[in-house]
Amino acid sequence: MKLLIDADFIVYKSCAAAETEVDFGSDVILVTSNFSDALSATRRELTKIRDQFGSFTPLILFFSDTVNFRKKILPEYKGHRNRKKPCGYKRVINQLKTEFEVIIMPELEADDAMGVYATQHPGNCIVSPDKDMKQIPGKLYNLDEQFTVSKESGAAWHLIQTLAGDQTDGYGGVPGVGVKRAETIFKEKGCSWKTVLETFKEKGLTEEDALVNARLARILTADDYDFNKKQPKLWSPSSDYKVNDGSGSKVKAVGTKNK
């Protein structure tokens, strides 16, 4: 088993912590960074994760590409996240490339690259605190607990996120519908694309609105990626797509906790 690690946030956090402001007075404030501190902090975080599984467990580090395919779907996607990367960010990644296997896939965020790899090579464990990764079937360690996500619960979580949206990423879902409300809707009406469309239309939104939100919410799997063209295949559900018939407990997409 390999650990598939969302390394974006680890390196970002480590580099940000290594920054120092130097105030020269007047209008001059300079930001400096200690590369050794940033790299050491990153290594410590990776060691801490590895120690949860055994010191010889192989790691693969995933980073986001500088181009994001979701911006072609919605130009405003993550538009408010305009803060530059902290000092040393690229240099730390370049150093990590000499120490670990690093994967950056064209146009994909780290989440998507992990989703594609995990479903192409089952039996590994994704390591990420991001709730989006509950879409991907298989083992997931969220830095607190380890879960096994079923294919059905992952598919349900995708539709739940389609309705609930993600304001931090810049797509709104259905106004007034959060995760809990989405779970209730699917429990009552069945977890299906038909239910998604009905819920969007009840708020005066369109099928196109629903599809845009679903495509933004979806974490890619191997089925969603064209390996020859090296680009994602946008999710296009059939009109009768469904996860379950509304029997109840299957709707809540959390997964089974591993002992």
Predicted region positions:
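Domain-level signal for Mg2+-assisted phosphodiester chemistry and nucleotide/NA-binding surfaces
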Residues: 1-94
